[in-house]
Swiss-Prot record:
GO terms for biological process: indole alkaloid biosynthetic process. It is a single-pass membrane protein. The lineage of its organism: Eukaryota, Viridiplantae, Streptophyta, Embryophyta, Tracheophyta. Gene3D superfamilies: Cytochrome P450. Its EC number is 1.14.14.104. The chain crosses the membrane at residues 3-23. A cytochrome P450 monooxygenase involved in the biosynthesis of ajmaline-type monoterpenoid indole alkaloids (MIAs) natural products, important plant-derived pharmaceuticals used in the therapy of heart disorders. Catalyzes the hydroxylation of vinorine to vomilenine, an intermediate chemical in the biosynthesis of ajmaline. Supports also vomilenine isomerization to perakine. It is an enzyme of class 1 (oxidoreductase). Keywords: Alkaloid metabolism, Heme, Iron, Isomerase, Membrane, Metal-binding, Monooxygenase, Oxidoreductase, Transmembrane, Transmembrane helix. InterPro entries: Cyt_P450, Cyt_P450_CS, Cyt_P450_E_grp-I, Cyt_P450_sf, Plant_Cytochrome_P450_Monoox. This is Vinorine hydroxylase.
C-alpha cells in the first residue's frame, strides 16, 4: 500500500472530523477577529489537507514554488490536520527572522525529534526554551567557538590531505599510472565526510569502507540521514491508532537507528575515556559543487588558474590561502544558492500570534521557508537558473551565507540558524580548493552531468555522477 492509498483510506475513515475542523476554523482567533489569513491553495481534503497534492515525481519544494507563483510569497498550507505557512520571498523571510524571530523560534513536535533527537535532546529538534538556550550556549562555547575550531584545524587539514592522497592512489591504481581514471565522486565525498565526523567526535578514521567496522558505522549514519528526511504521516495526522499501526514503517526504523547510534556513541565515549586514562594530554554539501563545475568547465578553469596564481603547484592550498581565493569563494556561494543543504529548511512553529507580510499567523502554526524558491527569485537574481559565480564578484559581492542577507540563506537565519555554519564553510572551501588544485576533471564522453534531484531532504542526485580524474600536481605532493 503506497502513501496515497494510506491517505485516501484515512480520509474515508475520518471524514467526520471535517465538522470539528470547520468548527475550529470558525472559532479560531483569526476567524473571530476577522483577521486576514494568508491565501490557501484550493483542493485541500478533510483530514489529509493538501498532502495528496504534494506527492508525485516533483520534489515538494518545486510544487510549493509553483503554488507561490499563483497564491503569493506567503500562503497557508494544510499539512494533514496541521496548519502551516510557507514563505518564499526575501521581505517576508526577513520579517520572520528579525521582527518575529522569537515568536517563530519553536520547533514543531515530530517523530524525528522524538526518536532520532533522543526525546528532543538534540539542539536542532529541541523546543524553544531554557534547555535549548543552555544547549546552544554550550555548543557555541565548547564545540563551535573560534578557539575550538582553531584547535580542530589540524584535524581538517590532516583529513583532507590523507583523503586526497588515498584518492590519488586509487586513480593511479585504476589507470595504471597514465591517463584519467573513473571515480564516483559521491562515494569519495561520503568517505571524507564520515572521517571528518569520526575524527572530530571520536578521534578515529577508516582508510576505506571495506572493513566490517567501517561498513557498520557508515550504514548507521546513512540510515540516520535517510530516516531524518522521511515524512511521517502520524506527525500531521496525530491519531494514536495511526502511530501504533506505523503503516510506513518509519517509526520502527527510527527507533532501531536511535538504539544503534546510542550504542555506537557509548562505545566511542568509553574508548575515549580509556585512552585519556592511558595517555597524557597533548596540544590540543562538496559533491554539488563538483557536479555543477563539471557542467561549467570555464568556471573550473578560472578557479584552477586563481589557485595556481596565488598558491602555485609546489605546495597544497591551505586555509590561510582561502581569503585570497575570491573566485573560489564565489563558486561556493553560487553552489549553495542553487543547491542549498535543505531546500525547505528546518520547520519552525509560532509560540505566539504574529504578523508576516500583512497576514495574521496564529499561535501553533508551522512555518516552512522555501529556500529553493528564494534562491531562484528573478527579482533578486539575474538569470537565477544559471550557474554564475561572477554575480558574487559584482552586484552581490557583499552577500554572504551566514544568515545576515535574506536573499541567501542556505543555513537558515535568526536564533535557530545552523550553529555549525562557520565549520561547514571552512570544510567546503578547503575541500573544493584541494580537489580543483589537485585534479583535472571531466565527464565520460564529455556529457553534461544529470542534475536531476532524487528523493530526500538534501537534494541528492537521482543518479550517481561518474567523473574522470587525473592528477595535475607533482607526484611527490600526493605521497604519504
Amino acid at each position: 500500500m503506497d502513501l496515497l492509498q494510506i491517505l485516501l483510506a484515512i480520509a474515508g475513515l475520518l471524514a467526520i472530523l471535517l465538522l470539528q475542523k470547520q468548527w475550529r476554523t470558525k472559532t479560531s482567533p483569526g476567524a473571530k477577529a476577522g483577521r486576514k489569513l494568508p491565501p490557501e491553495p484550493a483542493g485541500a481534503w478533510p483530514v489529509i489537507g493538501h498532502l495528496h497534492k504534494l506527492g508525485g515525481p516533483n520534489p515538494i519544494y518545486r510544487n510549493l514554488a509553483e503554488w507561490s507563483d499563483k497564491y503569493g510569497p506567503v500562503m497557508t498550507l494544510k499539512l494533514g490536520m496541521q496548519n502551516a505557512v510557507v514563505v518564499s520571498d526575501r521581505e517576508a523571510i526577513k520579517e520572520c527572522f528579525t521582527t518575529n524571530d522569537k515568536a517563530l523560534a519553536d520547533r514543531p513536535p515530530s517523530s524525528i525529534g522524538l526518536h532520532l533527537g533522543f526525546n528532543y535532546a538534540a539542539i536542532g529538534a529541541a523546543p524553544y526554551g531554557p534547555y535549548w538556550r543552555d544547549m546552544r550556549k554550550l555548543v557555541l562555547l565548547e564545540v563551535l567557538s573560534s578557539r575550538r575550531l582553531e584547535m580542530l584545524r589540524n584535524v581538517r587539514i590532516s583529513e583532507i590531505g590523507t583523503s586526497i592522497k588515498e584518492l590519488y592512489s586509487n586513480i593511479i591504481r585504476s589507470s595504471g599510472g597514465s591517463g584519467p581514471a573513473k571515480v564516483v565522486i559521491s562515494h569519495w565525498i561520503e568517505q571524507l565526510t564520515l572521517n571528518y565526523i569520526l575524527r572530530t567526535i571520536a578521534g578515529r578514521r577508516f582508510s576505506d569502507d571495506s572493513s566490517k567496522d567501517a561498513q557498520y558505522v557508515k550504514g548507521v549514519i546513512n540510515d540516520f540521514m535517510y530516516f531524518a528526511g522521511q515524512f511521517v504521516v502520524s506527525d500531521v495526522i496525530p491519531i494514536p491508532l495511526l502511530r501504533w499501526l506505523d503503516p510506513q514503517g518509519h517509526l520502527k526504523g527510527m527507533k532501531r537507528v536511535a538504539k544503534e547510534v546510542d550504542t555506537m556513541c557509548e562505545a566511542w565515549i568509553q574508548e575515549h575515556v580509556q585512552r585519556r586514562m592511558r595517555e597524557k594530554p597533548g596540544p590540543g554539501q562538496e559533491q554539488d559543487f563538483i557536479d555543477v563545475l563539471l557542467n561549467n568547465r570555464d568556471v573550473m578553469r578560472k578557479a584552477q588558474e586563481e589557485i595556481d596564481n596565488h598558491v602555485g603547484k609546489e605546495r597544497w592550498v591551505d586555509e590561510t590561502d582561502l581569503k585570497h581565493l575570491v573566485y573560489l569563494q564565489a563558486i561556493v556561494k553560487e553552489g549553495l544558492r542553487l543547491y542549498p543543504p535543505g531546500p525547505l529548511g528546518a520547520p519552525h512553529r509560532a509560540i505566539e500570534d504574529c504578523q508576516v507580510g500583512g497576514y495574521f499567523i496564529p499561535k501553533g502554526t508551522q512555518l516552512l521557508v522555501n529556500v529553493w524558491k528564494l534562491h531562484r527569485d528573478p527579482r533578486v537574481w539575474s538569470e537565477p537558473e544559471k550557474f554564475m559565480p561572477e554575480r558574487f564578484l559584482t552586484r552581490q559581492a557583499e552577500v554572504d551565507v551566514f544568515g545576515h542577507h535574506f536573499e541567501l540563506l542556505p543555513f537558515g537565519s535568526g536564533r535557530r540558524a545552523c550553529p555549525g555554519i562557520t565549520f561547514a564553510v571552512q570544510v567546503m572551501h578547503l575541500t573544493v580548493a584541494r580537489l580543483l588544485q589537485g585534479f583535472d576533471m571531466t565527464t565520460p564522453s564529455n556529457l553534461p552531468v544529470d542534475m536531476t534531484e532524487g528523493p530526500g531532504v538534501t537534494m541528492p542526485k537521482a543518479h550517481p555522477v561518474e567523473v574522470l580524474m587525473m592528477p595535475r600536481l607533482p607526484s611527490a605532493l600526493y605521497e604519504p
